[in-house]
């Protein structure tokens, strides 16, 4: 058992050094939106309901590319508006004895929220834009009803925070590069909750590889953890 743990630790250490950019990316229409949501959405039920969701432009591109009701012109307009930005959606609520929700006000969420970004080596604090860009405001207004139909009251009470995804030489948060986003929230009494961690690269954006045993290999893996065989 000790040797197995040592081997797994070695696999994980090597995996952290994998260059995802060398692997084949999926076309937007082939991205599994549900799988991508699983990688970018985190939920805690500590003293209520707490949900945080990082939404990159790739999410919208994948969603719109699969929607036959959206024209090419409308799709381009939306994606051009979103390009250069990502979003974080947060909803927090107390849950009553009968299952009723009492949602946190936006100010309370902002007060208890802390965002940190890692490049795989160091962490740095980041912050959302103080104001929503003009072009994005109409889009955010229609997201509430859409999420409400999909998630009920939780979706209707989502709070959206916009991040400027542009930086010199690339993107602030790239779902294709090694790193992590840490989202820390607090409850309504000010107690810090266990942070949410979203790790990159996102496996859902890549054409899957398979280990010899047929199990899927995460995009960050260099070798298969079950038998140590090298992945292509």
Please report, for each region that a protein language model flagged, where it lies by residue.
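Bacterial N-terminal signal peptides that target proteins for export
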Residues: 1-8
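Bacterial N-terminal signal peptides
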Residues: 8-17
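Conserved functional micro-motifs across diverse proteins
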Residues: 21-220, 225-232
């Amino acid at each position: 058992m000790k040797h197995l743990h040592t081997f797994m630790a070695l696999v994980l250490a090597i995996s952290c050094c994998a260059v995802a950019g060398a692997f084949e990316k999926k076309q937007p229409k082939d991205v599994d939106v549900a799988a991508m949501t699983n990688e970018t959405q985190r939920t805690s039920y500590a003293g209520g309901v707490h949900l945080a969701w990082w939404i990159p432009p790739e999410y919208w591109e994948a969603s719109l590319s699969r929607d036959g009701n959206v024209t090419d012109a409308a799709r381009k307009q939306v994606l051009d508006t979103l390009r250069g930005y990502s979003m974080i959606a947060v909803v927090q609520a107390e849950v009553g004895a009968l299952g009723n929700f009492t949602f946190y006000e936006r100010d309370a969420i902002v007060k208890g929220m802390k965002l940190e970004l890692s490049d795989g080596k160091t962490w740095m604090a980041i912050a959302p834009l103080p104001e929503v860009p003009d072009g994005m405001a109409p889009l955010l207004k229609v997201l509430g009803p859409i999420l409400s139909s999909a998630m009920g009251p939780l979706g209707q009470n989502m709070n959206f925070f916009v991040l400027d995804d542009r930086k010199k030489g690339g993107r602030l948060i790239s779902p294709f590069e090694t790193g992590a986003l840490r989202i820390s929230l607090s409850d309504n009494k000010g107690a810090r909750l266990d942070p949410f961690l979203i790790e990159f690269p996102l496996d859902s954006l890549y054409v899957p590889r398979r280990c010899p045993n047929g199990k899927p290999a995460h995009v960050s893996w260099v070798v298969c953890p079950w038998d140590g065989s090298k992945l292509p």
